[in-house]
Design a protein with these regions (language model features):
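Conserved catalytic-core motifs of GNAT/GCN5-like acyltransferases
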Residues: 109-111, 120, 124, 129-146
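Residue-level recognition of the GNAT/N-acetyltransferase active site
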Residues: 80, 84, 111-113
Length: 159
């Protein structure tokens, strides 16, 4: 039986798991920026959505997206190692993109570690295009590949 994972907004009780996943899967080798306290701050931020998937009460994936005046910015997206290649990342990303469209935003922008070809390939598969590189983006130590996706166009909304 295939079960579609449930996506929900994170609550402060999820912050520790999110922070630990960020440290292990995203911030490896860089120090720890997305601590539990910072995740809690994002959870309470009105311009940010923190979404999670869970299995048996444990966080299996998460995404953090900030909504600006002109575009959304995917801050972090991570899936626990034992739950990858099952579509969780794509589901979380699509959920966050739908929130951005609901907010009236045309584009999502993100940065991926240049030394993480799997992440870059994932975003390309999800319809993102490379928009450049940012030298030393991650604490001056690791370059980033900037990716962007147009979610809709004002012309799409015209009668």
């Amino acid at each position: 039986m295939i079960v579609t994972p449930h996506i929900s907004l994170a609550i402060p009780a999820h912050a520790r798991s999110i922070a630990e996943m960020s440290r292990e899967y995203i911030e490896y080798g860089l120090g720890w920026s997305w601590t539990q306290a910072r995740v809690i701050k994002a959870i309470h931020d009105e311009a940010t959505n923190v979404a999670v998937t869970q299995q048996r009460g444990a966080v299996t994936g998460f995404g953090i997206m900030r909504y600006g005046d002109e575009r959304a910015h995917l801050v972090l997206l991570g899936v626990a190692a034992g739950h990858r290649k099952r579509g969780l990342g794509a589901l979380l990303l699509a959920w966050l993109e739908k929130c951005a469209v609901t907010a009236g935003l045309e584009r999502v922008q993100l940065e991926a570690r240049a030394d993480n070809p799997d992440a870059i390939a994932f975003y390309l598969e999800q319809g993102y295009g490379q928009a450049g590189t940012v030298p030393g983006y991650y604490r001056g130590a690791v370059d980033a590949v900037r990716l962007e996706k147009r979610l809709w166009s004002p012309a799409d909304a015209a009668p």
